[in-house]
Amino acid sequence: EISERFFQLGHEHEIEDEIFNMELTPNRGDCLSLHGLVRDLAPFYEIDLTSDIYEKELKELELGFVNHAPEACSHISFLKIEIEGEIAAYRGKLKEYFKDLSINKNNFFTDISNYISYEMGQPTHCYDAKKISNLFSLEIIEEDKKFHTLLEKEVVIKGRNLVFLEDGNVINLAGVMGGKSTSCSTNTKSVIIECAHFN
């Protein structure tokens, strides 16, 4: 039945076991997540997607962040999360999910960030709060800069790029790749989560 609804909506797809492989057209980027597809199906099944799933009373985060490139990033926000005690076993619940999507398992915060990206269609990036200062910025740079990536590689960024800088050093190639210096690990208990819309 769901397959028929997808065809009615113009979504070409194939079914393998219980997995829908979607063939989305370039103009339907809003459907590049589970939430986006459910939103398309909602009228057929009278599903209400308007309920809030977040805590409205959030304490303001004191962060000395400056956006020097509003033309390249129109909206950006940060949320700090601290976990007390041990992180419960969670990978069993995400094991098949990650396997089906060919996602590598890393650490708790990175795994949850990847999960949210596929579920909600909103990429996020996690910084280990103990490895980043309160003073960093988003800037467009044009000079060559060295960058130590999450993949343990040191590269030279050339040309015009949108980057997050801390003390003049690149800590994140915006929307592309995070840096090793502020990355999360299995020992991370406090993170700053970046959620941005890059134009």
Predicted features along the sequence, with ranges:
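RNA/tRNA-interacting regions in translation and RNA-turnover enzymes
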Residues: E1-N199
